[in-house]
């Protein structure tokens, strides 16, 4: 009834994105809900964005596509048949998470270097530190998107704390019966 995909799509890659989403769509119940979290970059507009993408492709996620802007991701979800119910752009929060990862990375420097060497330690140190900066300045982000499979199978205001006093499951009392 529910599926959660946490940053899996980046590793699927652009060439397999549509197939991945079709498979997820087929697995989800008709009244199901999916939380789809995906990292992405804004559309490239400065030189740093190109350098970042090349670095990521060579050293961090070879063959993965963590560089898709939000409009592309939403389009893919909609073409797969999903209805987007909500979207949160959480890059600034994600940068705080990555900051903690970097602190853990540095705290375990000796262990990492002993097991993987100086080069890998430095590459990932650069990656984590740069990820914090690029997320804080808006160049990259993480998108948390809630989608449904069937527009009519779920109440559209469920999950909204207050929507003008409307209740997700209407009281089926006299008023409800008189309207229908």
What label would you give each PLM region?
Residues 37:
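Alpha/beta-hydrolase-fold catalytic nucleophile elbow
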Residues 16-17, 48:
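Short amphipathic alpha-helical segments
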Residues 4-9:
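A conserved beta-strand element that flanks and buttresses the S-adenosyl-L-methionine
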Residues 40-157:
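Substrate-binding/catalytic lobe of Class I Rossmann-like enzymes that use SAM or dcSAM, i.e.
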Residues 18-33:
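A short glycine-rich, Lys/Arg-flanked "PGG" loop and its adjoining helix->strand segment in the class I
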Residues 160-180:
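Short, cationic low-complexity segments
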Residues 1:
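Short conserved loop adjoining the S-adenosyl-L-methionine
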């Amino acid at each position: 009834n529910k599926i959660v995909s946490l940053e899996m799509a980046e590793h699927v890659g652009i060439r397999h994105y549509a197939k991945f989403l079709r498979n997820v769509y087929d697995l989800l119940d008709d009244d199901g809900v999916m939380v789809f979290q995906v990292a992405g970059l804004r559309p490239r507009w400065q030189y740093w964005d190109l350098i970042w993408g090349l670095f990521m492709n060579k050293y961090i996620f070879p063959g993965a596509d963590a560089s898709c802007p939000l409009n592309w991701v939403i389009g893919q979800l909609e073409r797969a048949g999903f209805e987007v119910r909500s979207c949160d752009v959480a890059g600034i929060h994600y940068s705080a998470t990555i900051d903690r990862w970097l602190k853990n990375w540095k705290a375990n420097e000796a262990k990492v270097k002993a097991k993987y060497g100086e080069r890998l330690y430095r590459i990932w140190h650069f990656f984590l530190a740069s990820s914090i900066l690029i997320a804080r300045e808006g160049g990259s982000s993480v998108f948390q998107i809630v989608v449904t499979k069937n527009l009519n199978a779920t109440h559209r205001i469920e999950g909204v704390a207050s929507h003008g006093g409307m209740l997700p499951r209407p009281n089926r009392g006299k008023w409800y019966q008189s309207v229908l």
